[in-house]
Each structure stands twice: as C-alpha cells, then as structure tokens.
C-alpha cells in the first residue's frame, strides 16, 4: 500500500503552529523564534516530513543557490576558500554549486551552464579568470563577486589582499637577512595578482638597494615550479646560485624547497631562504615550516559572501573593491632577520 505523503499542513497541526511558520522554520534566513523552530523540527522528524525545495523555488522564484567558479582545486588554498564559502553560505540558507572554468578557454559554455542552473549569484575563486569573463556573467543579470584577485573593471565587486605590500615585505625581509642574489618565481605572469606581488617585491628590493637577481615562472602549479627550480638552481655554479627566492604562492614555494632538498641537495635556509604567499595549512607543517604572507581567508570569505548577498537582495547596490592586509608568518625557511613593518 502506497504511503500517504506528509505535507506541511500535517506538520503544522502536530506542532500547533501555522503553515507559514513551518515554511519559515525550514528557511535559515527567515524570522522565526527558536522555540517555534524546535517544535516544527520535532514534528517533522516524527512524521518523516521533508520540504520540497524545488516546489518552493518555483513559488518564490528563488533558487537559494550560489555558484562557485574555480579553475582547479589542486592548490589547497582554493580548497580552503571553497570549504569556508560553502559553510558560510549554508548558514545563510543557500546551496552551493561548484563549476570548473574550462581548460580549453570556452567560457561561453560555462556561462550557459550558469544561466541554465538558475543560480542567484556567482563567487569567482579562479585566479585565471579575467574581468571580461566576469563581466560576461554579470551582463546576464547574475551578481558576481571575485575573490583573491582584483581586475581592472569597476563594475564588479572584488575582495582581495594587499599583494603589493606583501611582495614589498618579502623583498625587504630577504634583503635584511643579508641575501644578495634574490630570485622571483612568478605565478601566471599576466595576472593582476602576480603583477602586484612582483611589483611590490621589486620595490622592496629597491628600498634595500638591490634588484631581482633571477626570474622564472611556475604558473602557480607544483610541477611547473619544480621545473623552474631546476632551471634556476641546477645550471649554475655555487657562486651564481640564487641565495633567496620569493614565490608568488605557497604551493610553488614548497615545490622549490622539496626540489632543492631532494634533488639538488641544497638545504633551506642554509643555502637558500624561501618565502611564499597565502599561508595555506601545510605551510606550517614541520617538514615545510615556510615563511609566508598570510591572507585573511576568513575575512575575505565573509566580506565576499556578504557583498554577494547584498547584490542579490539589492541589484542596484554599488560594487565595492576591498583590499585586505596580509600578515607575515616567519618560520624556519628563512634565517633570523629584522621584522620590517
């Protein structure tokens, strides 16, 4: 015999509340007392009631769904951003859909997927995405907020960290250690994030009377950074080896340290001091103990999601560009020196 489906009216009768109170109790962002919510949830568990979120979205014309677009999760920093964004949005009563930016550059296909999915807003975590792609999504009336990079387009809200100041600190700090041959390992050269970190780094060196000794590119990827380390360190004499390196992110910095240690038998920091950028969790592991610039990841996520929800509720809200400070985290990958402000 087919079991009769349980409705919100059944739950309301058992809990002794109105149907609208039942509906509000299943919407985390709705106003309802904790006492009422508890009564509704107990009644729902007793009856085996499950709200029909699809039907609700058709009635309210609200999917309560946010898309997160990223290029890859191989970098643990972006995996951490994704986790924190998901938890925060769930607390606000939203669901999260994950999209990966196509490697073949066919961004139109991604835009079509976002529109078909009827998402209410988009968080872009991909450092490879540019302002034209973000604007393409926004042109369809979908609110967009970019995290961890700034783009030269004022029509979209952006939340990033102070890349220039972080690079500036790295350049001055390495020079303060007495290092004379300081290299830079770039991420994606044309990205604004990389340009800001590189420009800050070179300005910091200049403040100490130095210039960048050597340069290579690791594209923010582990394997490419290993290849770059081999080019930078395996074809030189000891007198012409870089004695310090600033990498544009932690993943590349760790790749350099492991290549130096395991393949080239150059110890860190005795031969080479290394600094990264991000302060992802594994950077603090004893096997790495990487000096780095910590991005305020919790604050970035809170600010970005709050901005996105503001744009969803008020499409006329003006876009904001927020730049948050970074914090040096000095560990064993650099020798002791003077902590510069």
Q: What are the language-model segments listed below?
A:
Residues 14, 19-24, 58-74, 84, ...:
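Short beta-strand segments enriched in small/hydrophobic residues
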Residues 1-63:
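N-terminal helix-turn-helix DNA-binding module of bacterial transcription factors
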Residues 234-341:
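Flexible loop/turn connectors
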Residues 1-3, 61-172, 176, 234:
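Alpha-helical recognition/docking segments in bacterial nutrient-uptake
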Residues 70-80, 98-107, 149, 159-169, ...:
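Hinge/beta->alpha junction and helix N-cap segments in small-molecule ligand-binding domains
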Residues 119-126, 183-185, 215-216, 237-249, ...:
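Periplasmic-binding protein-like
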Residues 47, 117-118, 177-178, 232-241, ...:
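Glycine-rich phosphate-binding loop signature in dinucleotide/nucleotide-binding domains
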């Amino acid at each position: 015999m087919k079991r009769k489906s349980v409705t919100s009216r059944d739950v309301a009768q058992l809990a002794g509340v109105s149907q609208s109170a039942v509906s509000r109790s299943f919407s985390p962002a709705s106003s309802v007392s904790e006492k009422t919510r508890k009564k509704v949830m107990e009644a729902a568990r007793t009856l085996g009631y499950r709200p029909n979120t699809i039907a609700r979205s058709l009635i309210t014309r609200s999917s309560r769904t946010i898309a997160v677009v990223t290029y890859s999760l191989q970098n643990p920093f972006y995996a951490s951003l994704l986790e924190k964004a998901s938890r925060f949005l769930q607390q606000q009563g939203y669901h999260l859909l994950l999209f990966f930016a196509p490697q073949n550059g066919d961004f139109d296909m991604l835009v079509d997927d976002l529109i078909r999915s009827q998402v209410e807003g988009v968080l872009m975590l991909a450092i490879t995405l540019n302002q034209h792609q973000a604007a393409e999504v926004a042109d369809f009336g979908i609110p967009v907020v970019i995290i961890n990079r700034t783009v030269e387009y004022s029509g979209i809200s952006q939340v990033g960290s102070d890349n220039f100041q972080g690079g500036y600190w790295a350049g001055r700090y390495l020079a303060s250690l007495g290092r004379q041959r300081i290299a830079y390992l770039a991420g994606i050269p044309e990205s604004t994030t990389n340009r800001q970190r590189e420009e800050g780094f070179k300005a910091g060196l200049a403040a100490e009377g130095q210039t960048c000794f050597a340069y290579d590119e690791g594209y923010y990827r582990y394997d490419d950074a290993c290849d770059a380390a081999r080019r930078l360190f395996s074809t030189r004499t000891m007198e012409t080896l870089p004695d310090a390196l600033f990498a544009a992110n932690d993943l590349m910095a760790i790749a350099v340290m492991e290549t130096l240690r395991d393949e080239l038998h150059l110890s860190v920091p005795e031969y080479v001091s290394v600094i990264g950028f991000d302060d992802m969790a594994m950077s603090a592991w004893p096997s790495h103990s990487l000096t780095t610039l910590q991005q305020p990841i919790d604050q970035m996520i809170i600010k970005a999601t709050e901005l996105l929800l503001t744009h969803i509720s008020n499409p006329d809200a003006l876009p904001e560009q927020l730049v948050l400070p970074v914090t040096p985290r000095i560990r064993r990958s650099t020798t002791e020196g003077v902590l510069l402000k």
